[in-house]
Amino acid sequence: MEIWKVIFSIWFLLFQNFVLSAKNDDNKLKVIRGRNVIYNGNVIPLSILIRNGKTIGIKDYSFNPKKLNENYEILYDDRECNNNEDFIIMGGLVDSHVHVNEPGRTEWEGFESATSAAAAGGVTTIVDMPLNSSPVTTSFKNLLDKIESMKGKLRVDVGLLGGIVPGNSKEIKKMVLQGGVLGFKSFLLPSGIDEFPPVNENDIQEAMNEMKLLKCQYNNSDVIMMFHAEVEEPIKEATVRLKNENADPKLYKTYLDSRPKISENQAISKLIDITRQNQIVSTHIVHLSSSESIEQIREAMDQGVPISAETTYNYLHLTSESVPYGNTLFKSAPPVREHENKELLWNAIINGTIKLIVSDHSPCTINLKQLKEDNQSIGDFLKAWGGISSLELGLPIIWTECKNRGIPITQLSEWLSNGPSKLVGLNDRKGSIEIGRDADFVIFNPNESFIVNEKKLFLKNKFSAYNGEKLFGVVYETILRGNSIFKKGDNKIKKIIGQRLIKSNLINKK
């Protein structure tokens, strides 16, 4: 019976994608024209031709579509708009680290609100983590539950990760070949979700052995293994010491001291050793926070170890010194660290050690932050849920930092779009403006600033560590596969045309 559910699930996905394309009249030629298009590492004037949701032509800015002698639609033309000479057109953002929390914890977030927030932020693709939903995505059966929960809710395209926990390595093959997951994630310490326990070295080896078999037997592309890289012992020792010292749990420094860099450093060292021995399965460090780990990652990469790392919007913008007393909206794991640490992370981004920037969007309810909705309550950092909501704000957060540092705007495309799409194997269709790729774009004004108003965000729980902050880079329009899904001023994302993304070459059709 289960195999028929598998066949039906894959058939439904393909049929749904076909119907969505037909419904949106994608066969009609569409044109985007702009003076400032990020293309091949440059900002140049271009005309972009779109059909069936794909970019089919890249022409000079002066190109006249009337010469093609067919009906066409102008999606965007900066010559027909006022005061937009500075607007940038870029490939839609890809956020490969998002916690959507559906099914089971939709009071935290959900596919409707998360994908709406993504669209409003210029993000056209997100990848959902496997642990904060209930059930967690650690089996093929649970994966089908998540797929079912997505139907009729997606405003942007969504890929899924599976989870690796002790004893579930035999689920890997089915989740990849029949479920189409883009990769897997594990924790080296308790995740905070009882159903998603940490793995040890034997568990990792078992999982890697399964992935080796997949790669060798089916001649398939690499399936990434992602790790939350902290070990527990240094954290437990630091927490006991701080409690014995009666350290104030409402002071952010107390939480920061409870999560020392050595916890990350030791975990990453262990993962480098395992990956070096394995050499076939690629591993990826999610949300790198400790600057002390940068050098060992760089050395391993230079030695040919298949390992990579990401960092987050939060670690590149926020600092521990600026966290207000008791404001647990700033709590994440690993933690936001000192200004000096932030600068070293930026150095690693600029020199290419860290190749992508993501949100690690991890929302929850206000009570789990040990706060109330009066905006005046004081929270306990040691008890509050760790996670910062930033999915909608990534483009302006990182552009504000780049603008202040004199970093070219073209780097946004590499760090926020192309890098994440490569990580999860979607760069054949996502991540940049190229002929044959999905016609996903964000149009924004890099010179316009705004003040973050948390109540106007599309998130389900409308509170933010960025509330009241001035950021540069206002998103004016988001386009998904040639369809405009968001325009500045929209208070609801009405088009539900998002699709589940799979590695089509990994689906076993035999």
Swiss-Prot record:
Residues annotated with N6-carboxylysine modification: 185
Matching Gene3D superfamilies: Metal-dependent hydrolases (3.20.20.140)
Residues that coordinate or bind Zn(2+) 2: 185, 228, 287
Keyword Nucleus found: no
Annotated signal sequence range: none
Cofactor: Zn(2+)
The record's free-text note on cofactor binding: Binds 2 Zn(2+) ions per subunit.
A Pfam family recorded for this sequence: Amidohydro_1
Keywords, in A-Z order: Hydrolase, Metal-binding, Purine metabolism, Zinc
Pathway: Nitrogen metabolism; (S)-allantoin degradation; allantoate from (S)-allantoin: step 1/1
Molecular functions (GO terms): allantoinase activity; cobalt ion binding; zinc ion binding
Binding annotation for Zn(2+) 1: 97, 99, 185, 360
Post-translational modification: Carboxylation allows a single lysine to coordinate two zinc ions.
UniProt KW Metal-binding keyword: yes
Assembly and interaction partners: Homotetramer.
Family under the similarity heading: Belongs to the metallo-dependent hydrolases superfamily. Allantoinase family.
Protein name as it appears in the record: Probable allantoinase 2
Organism listed in the record: Dictyostelium discoideum (Social amoeba)
